[in-house]
């Protein structure tokens, strides 16, 4: 699915035309949520599997997800994503934040509540019945969290399948790292607002212990010298995310 990219993926796809039943679809740039929905509408089959253009699924990725659907045919399945550029500290930190979120939100793998869209598979019928991703989200920042919450709030289950591995090659600089987390904060505002409206309550943030645990998390995963640098970047990411959240909130207040 080509969401209005400046470099056409046509040449990459052509090498598989004689090997796989594959189609290249395209649209004017509308954001990842709209692009996934567009691709899903043209997909054939009972299940949909999503990944991103900077990801490399393992050779057994689809087979592993298919085996998961044998056991959980009505559930959304999400696999494990690993950092494909381990020598990049910013990319390492960004993936470690996701790893922490999986640890926090998915203590029971068969009752997961958060799965990222770069390693996600769902029953097509239920995906379409829910309306797919919310296409109002124009940037890659929280649209998967919103879909997961909508899925669970309808009584559907999500299952974490760590054997379904995708490698993520997202090279970051200090500038793109902080921009990414600023956008995550923007997305978090809309997610929290949707979460609150769905439950007819006020917008609530996580408790302080959630953010403190995120800062401590690298020390349980890495050598102390590298963990300190990662923890410092996580603090910076939290500041950037908070800035994005309150920036988006202020814009909404001004619009009112």
Report each predicted region and the residues it spans:
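Acidic donor-binding segment of Leloir-type glycosyltransferases
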Residues: 1-26
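Donor nucleotide-sugar recognition loop
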Residues: 56, 113, 128-160, 164-167
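Short aromatic/hydrophobic "clamp" motif used to bind/position activated sugar donors
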Residues: 48
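A recurrent flexible, glycine/aromatic-enriched loop bordering the glycosyltransferase active site
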Residues: 83, 103-125, 138-142, 146
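Glycine-rich, basic loop-to-helix element that forms the pyrophosphate-binding segment
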Residues: 27-43
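Short, acidic/glycine-rich phosphate-metal binding loop used to engage nucleotide
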Residues: 21, 25-32, 56
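Conserved donor NDP-sugar-binding/catalytic core segment of glycosyltransferases
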Residues: 60-91
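Active-site-adjacent helix/loop segment of glycosyltransferases
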Residues: 158-243
